[in-house]
Amino acid sequence: MDANTQNISEATIALIDSLKSTTSHYGLANSGSEYKIITEMFLYKYFNDKFGYEAKRDKIYGERLSKADKWDAEYDKFTEEEVEDLFSYLPASVPLLKPEHTLAHLYNTSGAGDFSTRLDATLIDIANLNADTFSVVTSGKSRVNIFSALTQFVTDPQKRDDFARSLMSSVASFNFESVFAEKYDFFSRIFEYLIKDYNNAGGGKYAEYYTPRAIAQVMARLLVGDNADLRGMTCYDPSAGTGTLLMALAHQIGEDRCTIFSQDISEKSSEML
């Protein structure tokens, strides 16, 4: 593991621990809702940083955003027409965020009342905006959005705003843009860390046969070899966990030269996928 990957791995763990500290403080430690809160807040952070990274590379609007002191503050100045125009230029694999969806925009409103409602509404709005590209399809062909309201898991409504602020404070303190060019699989790292933690706490054996990221990379190299001429490949894993092996295969083959399909019976794994 190179130094930059090691740093981002450590930052990922630090972020998880920060979020777990918040959920523990509000009585949600080692619960199913804690797992959902951590993964969804991390995904929101991922969406925010990924969108910013790609928007600043856009040929039309990239220079304007990248030269600004803060890209998200400049993005707040975009008209609705400019936002839609930017969306049309971004690759289909990039999550879309409107100016009011960015982490900085939302965080700057955290001092206002009813912040928990604002956080939940933002997550649901992002899920709806990206439903065609980022969602889970069940075996019954139902579509499950990737985000849902999170602050409802705190039973006391009077504590929800502070809970939301604490969650936002955790994710606002990190920036993962520097690692996107390296194809780092964030979610396999989260999965490995959380599952080990939950199994230790509860004595369970959930996902005891998951494939560690390092092993998945070796398996992908063995399966693909040095073949640089692969085109239009299809990869399917019916028990994918978080998709670590599929991600490794896609990176080895080339993301633009393959299509991956994943499935898992576990609800936790499906959320990760």
PLM regions and their residue ranges:
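Non-catalytic, mostly N-terminal accessory regions of nucleic-acid modification and defense proteins
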Residues: 1-227
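Conserved S-adenosyl-L-methionine
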Residues: 205-273
